[in-house]
Amino acid sequence: MLGDLLMEINGQMTSITVEPPVAEGTKVQVQAASEISGRVSGASLETHYVFIRSDGQTGGGEGHGLINTADGEAIQVYYPWGMGRATSPGTFTVKGCVTFSTVSSDLEWLNEVLGVWEGTWDLANREWRTSVYEWEYPE
């Protein structure tokens, strides 16, 4: 069951690299710098590996990153899988899951969180916006 909103991510894609094709389609590497607000706040640097299927309309990928919180703590972020579909040329609605790892005693609760996210990637304007929710265990 979806739980509380953990964070809102608003970022700029600082680098977009089209790599050689793979079996799934066109492979794209995206690096992003983001501001994060919510239950967790701070800034992040992330790298995402995305493939866009040959239909140009759907795709998926994975990513990883580092969040530096407003309190100076570090959180490793891993996006093991995400999916998306085009809503207009260069713009995708995306969704997926995310896990966290930290040694911070104040944030160690994140080590047991599976997050789910949804948002938009605007390749033309190099922007991305994502909301991350906690996927809660059944009672």
Task: List PLM regions with ranges.
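Beta-strand-enriched cores of mature, soluble protein domains
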Residues: M1-E139
